[in-house]
């Protein structure tokens, strides 16, 4: 497997959700953008992660902060991490769709999804 950095594969054009956003509005945004996930960001920093499944079981009137996964409940990638066989195996084992990607200042700079990896490998 060719070693590459997360930042070479990640999606830099991602949806940014606030903890104060309302579930129903986020559902519409995700649907419109054809996404199943989004980082929850406050002051440029990752504070959580929301998925379509979280929204499905939550209330459309709830704030995202009440529905999101907290940062200690998710895997966070750094943009200079390497995409290794171990990472790929972890994605497969956990059936994860995507991860948030941060830089050295803990600012969200992108997301890495299974689809980003597939596109990268297809276009090599």
UniProtKB/Swiss-Prot annotation:
Domain notes: The CBS domains bind adenosine derivatives (AMP, ATP, NADP and SAM). The CBS domains can also bind calf-thymus DNA and E-boxes recognized by transcription factors. Binding of the nucleotides induces protein conformational changes.
PROSITE patterns the UniProt entry points to: CBS (PS51371)
Subunit structure: Exhibits a pH-dependent oligomerization state: at pH 7, the dominant species is a dimer, where each monomer is a two-CBS domain protein, and at pH 4.5-4.8, the dominant species is a tetramer, with an oblong shape. At pH 2.5, there is formation of intermolecular hydrogen bonds, suggesting the presence of high-molecular weight species. The physiological dimeric species is thermal and chemically very stable.
Coiled-coil intervals, chain numbering: none
InterPro entries, A to Z: CBS_dom, CBS_dom_sf
Keywords: CBS domain, DNA-binding, Repeat
Source organism (scientific name): Methanocaldococcus jannaschii (strain ATCC 43067 / DSM 2661 / JAL-1 / JCM 10045 / NBRC 100440)
Protein name as it appears in the record: CBS domain-containing protein MJ0729
Cited SUPFAM superfamilies: CBS-domain pair
Signal peptide: none
Keyword Amino-acid biosynthesis in annotation: no
Residue ranges of domain CBS in the record: 10-67, 70-124
CDD domains for the chain: CBS_pair_SF
Lineage per the UniProt record: Archaea, Methanobacteriati, Methanobacteriota, Methanomada group, Methanococci
